[in-house]
Regions:
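An acidic-aromatic loop/edge-strand motif
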Residues: 44-57, 353-404, 491, 504-559
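Positively charged n-region of N-terminal signal peptides that target proteins for export
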Residues: 1-5
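Solvent-exposed beta-strand/loop surfaces of large extracellular or lumenal domains
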Residues: 480-503
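Bacterial N-terminal signal peptides
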Residues: 7-17
Length: 600
């Protein structure tokens, strides 16, 4: 009898333990984060250090990093992140414990990335304050509006505002921003087809995750269940700039429709998820800081509606706008334009020798670039795979060369039968930005592609840095002494010489004595002017250490050391809060702090 008694005692003990464990278990806290590109998050991990430079935000950085400087991993917070390209055509789900990398992921939605959104510090501070395990379900796509793609079901069909409908009625033939009468049915059909698509994707994904939370969160206790503990909405930019849905000058009532739509959105989300009192945070768009007052007020307005009092909270993100980065950004544009330009041209296409930044870099080698003889030939693609069937702005591509031409860029290639001439080599008229380039020392010829070679002598290599100065309408390959040192696949609208600073791997091919420079390029045409046109000139230039110091000092007038320090906190444009981790970290913390008092 004794073994049976012992077995019964052991079984009873485990039953008591399991019962006690289940009684102590707490429901899984589920938070939903949704919106467009700023909810995705474009803050590069590389901007983390900037957070620590400000005494007010330095404590945030300590929460975000391990002692060794790596991003923290939250042991009690799990992520299900539905995202993908802006059109939703290739969605994927990112899973795992919360860490840095659940921001924007481009076309690899299932892979951990190099960016964060507000979810990182949101989860960190929720984990810090809550005892329960936490699941964050995040759904976000760039470029999606509340008036169309996230349109809630109860808002009804999209209707043109009265002012816009009257404008359309006035111009049946169409006008700027006004479709022709015969195209309007398709416009409306497309609008109806797009309406609510991303709202449904969001709801469907949340329901899918909640059908089996253990798939995402291994610590989920089925007996304890889960609690829909809060929803955070961070969106707005596409509505802010939508002049069709919100017409007229910026004034207090301009964005009333957004307030109406957002109220419907809150009601519908709660209804569709069977969570009538689920706490809801509106992340009020703070792009441009305290500007866009009327839109920000419209966004926050639902929080003041009687039906939402106490469980809908508007969190203004404008206070997190970084004014130091904002001040430096325009200067960075000017700075980048200067350092990426080798030489500017005057209206007639000749060199602008009076340009302030012209004097620091000097041509390398003899004879001087303008005196060098190039040998060149043009060819057309002959194989079907190399021909463009339709217009493409990016025309540059590699084609199959005639037999015997495969190594045309090598120093020992025999180019004696090629045409000779000075550069730039060109054809047609390249006209843009008030500059007309139509006079060329050498004519390109009829072929689309150009192969060109020249030689120059170098006596010494005593420059601090070297660069390629290149004039080209389309893309190009540049070879130095038989080695490819640069490829550019896009195009250049403005006629000017671009500056491409060479690294060690490229400079090592530059030598004392004779050097062979070879270039592969192609021409351009556009739909309005099918005549082909082109221009190409390439030269290697150097800058001495003394001139580099002078240039750096002069450039500080454009972009000061203080500005450069601020820009270390930026990795994207202003519409993405500069891709600044400092801004997104503060937002995530603020969203968590808004929801915490509403937790049961």
């Amino acid at each position: 009898m004794r073994p049976k008694i012992l077995t019964a005692l052991v079984a009873g003990f485990f039953a008591i333990c399991v019962s006690a464990t289940s009684a102590d278990a707490k429901p899984l806290k589920v938070f939903i984060l949704a919106g467009q590109s700023n909810m995705e998050g474009h803050a590069a991990i590389s901007t983390f250090d900037y957070i620590g430079k400000d005494p007010l935000t330095a404590p945030l950085l300590k929460e975000m990093r391990n002692p060794d400087g790596t991003p923290r991993v939250c042991d009690k917070v799990w992520m299900s992140y539905l995202t993908g390209p802006y059109d939703g055509s290739a969605n994927g789900e990112g899973l795992g414990k919360l860490t840095a990398g659940f921001g924007e992921r481009g076309n690899q939605p299932t892979k951990i990335g190099g960016k964060i959104g507000p979810e990182f510090t949101f989860g960190i501070y929720m984990e810090k304050e809550l005892k329960e395990p936490i699941l964050i379900i995040k759904t976000a796509w760039g470029g999606r509006s509340l008036n169309t793609e996230f349109r809630p079901p109860s808002a009804g069909q999209y209707r043109l505002p009265k002012e816009i409908q009257e404008l359309w009625d006035k111009y049946p033939q169409g006008a700027h921003g006004v479709p022709k009468l015969e195209d309007r049915k398709k416009w409306r059909d497309d609008k109806d087809a797009a309406s609510g698509v991303f709202y449904r994707m969001m709801i469907d994904h949340v329901k899918k995750v909640l059908l089996n939370p253990k798939r995402v969160c291994p610590e989920y206790d089925e007996q304890a269940g889960f609690e829909l503990a809060g929803f955070v909405w961070l969106q707005g930019f596409n509505d802010l700039v939508d002049g069709t849905t919100y017409p007229g000058p910026d004034q207090p009532r301009k964005y009333d429709e957004y307030s109406r739509l957002l109220a419907h959105f809150i009601r519908d989300v709660r209804k569709d998820l069977s969570a009538p009192k689920m706490p809801f945070v509106i992340g009020v768009l703070g792009v441009d800081g305290e500007k866009n007052v009327n839109f920000r007020k419209a966004m926050a307005a639902p929080a003041d509606m009687p039906e939402f009092k106490g469980n809908v909270i508007a969190v203004d993100t404008a206070p997190f706008w970084d004014h130091a980065i904002a001040a430096a950004m325009p200067k960075q544009g000017e700075y980048n334009n200067i350092v990426s330009t080798a030489h500017t041209l005057k209206a007639d296409g000749t060199f602008d020798r009076d340009w302030k930044w012209e004097k620091y870099w000097k041509p390398v080698g003899n004879p001087l670039p303008q005196e060098r003889t190039w040998r060149f030939m043009t060819i057309d693609p002959t194989e079907k795979k190399d021909k463009l069937e339709k217009y493409d702005a990016r025309r540059f591509r590699d084609i199959t060369l005639p037999a015997g031409m495969e190594k045309w860029y090598m120093p020992d290639f025999d180019d004696r039968t090629w045409t000779e001439g000075k550069a730039p080599i060109g054809k047609g008229v390249w006209k843009h930005s008030g500059i007309t380039l139509d006079k060329f020392p050498s004519k390109w010829g009829e072929g689309e592609f150009l192969l060109m070679r020249t030689t120059f002598e170098i006596e010494d290599l005593n420059c601090e840095s070297y660069r390629i100065a290149v004039l080209a309408r389309q893309g190009f390959h540049v070879y130095l002494n038989g080695q490819k040192i640069h490829t550019y696949i896009w195009w250049q609208d403005k006629p000017q010489y671009g500056s491409i600073v060479l690294g060690k791997e490229q400079i090592k091919h530059l030598k004392k004595g004779e050097n062979v420079l070879a270039v592969y390029a192609n021409d351009q045409y556009d739909l309005n002017s099918p005549e082909h046109y082109a221009a190409i000139d390439v030269r290697i230039e150097g800058i001495t250490k003394a001139d580099q110091e002078k240039l750096d000092l002069a450039l500080e007038e454009v972009l000061s050391p203080k500005d450069r320090e601020a820009l270390k906190g930026s990795s994207n444009g202003g519409y993405h809060y500069f891709g600044s981790a400092k801004i997104f970290a503060q937002m995530g913390k603020a969203f968590a702090e808004a929801l915490l008092p509403l937790q049961k």
